[in-house]
C-alpha cells in the first residue's frame, strides 16, 4: 500500500531502520510536502514533527488502517496538503512485525472486528509496550533509532482497550503531566488536552480519559494511568515530547473506531499547526532546564487529595453469576446508560528523587547496557 502511495505521490517517502525480532527491518513512512531526501535532516527541521506508532499490539489494528487512510487523504487533497505544509508526519505502519505476521481470528475474542489480525506478543513473545526503556528486543532498539532521527514534537501511539464498558468509542491517555514537568507539562494538561477535546467535540466525537479501572466500575472514580518509561509515551516523555496513547473501545464497531482514531490524529495535527511556535519553545526550554537540574524525580504516586470531576457517560454495572466459573462476574447493562459526575485523579506527586551523577561507570562486560 505505502509503496504504491509513495510511487504515486512524491510527498510520501519510505525508510527502513535496524532490524526487529522478526528479522524484518522497522519501516517509517514520512509525509512532507516537499518530500524527504535526507532522513537525517528531519530532526532539525523548523517544521512540526509528528511521530505515529501503530501495531505495537497488532490485534489492536485501528491505527494501522486509520494512518493509511489519513496519509492517502492528505496527498490526494490539495487543501490538506496546503494545510499541513508546515508539518512532517512520520508513521510507523506496524511496530510489532512478528506479531502482525502471526495472524488469527480468535486471540481477541471480545473485540468487535476486524475479522483477522495479528498477535499481541512479538516474534519472541515480548509485550513491546513494556520494553522501551530496557530494550530487550531489537524492535525497541530500532524504535529508539527512529525516535531520535525524527525528534518528534508530538508522539501518538494507537491502541484498542480491553476493559470496562462505557458509551465512548475512543479514549485518550496523555502522558502524565507532572512527570513531563514544568511549563511543558502544564501546557499539555491545561492547553493541549482540553483543546483536543474541544476539537473532537466539534466533530461529534465524544472522548474521555482512558478508563483505568480494575475489578470495579468507573463511577466509583479512577486515577490517570501512569505511563512509566517502560511504555511508549513514558519513554518519549524523557526527551520532552508531547505524547499520548489512543485507546479505542474493543466492543464498539471497527469502522467507528477507525474513523474516530482518524479524526483524533487530524485534531492533533491541527493543534500542532496552531501552536507550533509555543511547542518548540517549550521543548527547547525544557531540555535546557533539565541540564541545569541537580536532582531528578524517579518515583511518583497519585495524589488522592486532588481530583477533577468528569461528566462521564457509562453503563450500569452489576455482579452476576458466571456460567463459566460458577462465581460472580462484572456485567455492564448497555440498556441502562447514565451520565454522572465521576472523580478523576490525574495529579501525581514525587516520592523519590536522586542526585544527578556526573557519570555512570559500567564494567566492560555489561555491553548490553
Report each predicted region and the residues it spans.
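Active-site-proximal beta-strand/loop segments in catalytic clefts of secreted hydrolases
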Residues: 17-19, 31-33, 54-56, 92-96, ...
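Short secondary-structure junctions
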Residues: 10-16, 207-209, 369
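Structural signal for hydrophobic packing residues in well-ordered secondary-structure cores
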Residues: 6, 75-78, 147, 200-204, ...
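Conserved beta-strand scaffold positions in the cores of enzyme catalytic domains, especially
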Residues: 14, 28, 91, 125, ...
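Hard-cation-handling environments
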Residues: 213-369
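Active-site/substrate-binding loop(s) of hydrolase catalytic cores
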Residues: 44-53, 61-219, 224-230
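Short, solvent-exposed loop/turn elements at domain surfaces
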Residues: 37-39, 60-61, 101, 255, ...
Amino acid at each position: 500500500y505505502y509503496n504504491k502511495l509513495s510511487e504515486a505521490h512524491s510527498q510520501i517517502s519510505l525508510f527502513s531502520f535496524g532490524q526487529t525480532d522478526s528479522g524484518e527491518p522497522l519501516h517509517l513512512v514520512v509525509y512532507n510536502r516537499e518530500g524527504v531526501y535526507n532522513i537525517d535532516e528531519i530532526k532539525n527541521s523548523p517544521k512540526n514533527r509528528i511521530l505515529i506508532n501503530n501495531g505495537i499490539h497488532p490485534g489492536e489494528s485501528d491505527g494501522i488502517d486509520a494512518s493509511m487512510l489519513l496519509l492517502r487523504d492528505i496527498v490526494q487533497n490539495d487543501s490538506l496538503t496546503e494545510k499541513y505544509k508546515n508539518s512532517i508526519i512520520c508513521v510507523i505502519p506496524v511496530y510489532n512485525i512478528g506479531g502482525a505476521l502471526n495472524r488469527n481470528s480468535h486471540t481477541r475474542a471480545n473485540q468487535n472486528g476486524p475479522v483477522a489480525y495479528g498477535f499481541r506478543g512479538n516474534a519472541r513473545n515480548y509485550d513491546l509496550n513494556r520494553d522501551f526503556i530496557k530494550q530487550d528486543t531489537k524492535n525497541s532498539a530500532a524504535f529508539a533509532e527512529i525516535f531520535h532521527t525524527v525528534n518528534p514534537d508530538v508522539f501518538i501511539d494507537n491502541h484498542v482497550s480491553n476493559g470496562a464498558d462505557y458509551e465512548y468509542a475512543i479514549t485518550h491517555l496523555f502522558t502524565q503531566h507532572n512527570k513531563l514537568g514544568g511549563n511543558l507539562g502544564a501546557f499539555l494538561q491545561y492547553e493541549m488536552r482540553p483543546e483536543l477535546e474541544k476539537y473532537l467535540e466539534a466533530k461529534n466525537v465524544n472522548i474521555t480519559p482512558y478508563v483505568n479501572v480494575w475489578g470495579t466500575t468507573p463511577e466509583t472514580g479512577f486515577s490517570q494511568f501512569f505511563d512509566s518509561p517502560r511504555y511508549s509515551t513514558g519513554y518519549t516523555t524523557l526527551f520532552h515530547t508531547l505524547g499520548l496513547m489512543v485507546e479505542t473501545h474493543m466492543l464498539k464497531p471497527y469502522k467507528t473506531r477507525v474513523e474516530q482514531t482518524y479524526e483524533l490524529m487530524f485534531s492533533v495535527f491541527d493543534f500542532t499547526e496552531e501552536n507550533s511556535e509555543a511547542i518548540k519553545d517549550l521543548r527547547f526550554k525544557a531540555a535546557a532546564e533539565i541540564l541545569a537540574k541537580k536532582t531528578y524525580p524517579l518515583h511518583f504516586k497519585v495524589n488522592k487529595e486532588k481530583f477533577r470531576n468528569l461528566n462521564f457517560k457509562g453503563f450500569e454495572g452489576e455482579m452476576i453469576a458466571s456460567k463459566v466459573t460458577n462465581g460472580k462476574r462484572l456485567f455492564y447493562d448497555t440498556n441502562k446508560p447514565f451520565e454522572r459526575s465521576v472523580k478523576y485523579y490525574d495529579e501525581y506527586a514525587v516520592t523519590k528523587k536522586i542526585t544527578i551523577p556526573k557519570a555512570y561507570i559500567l564494567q566492560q562486560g555489561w555491553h548490553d547496557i
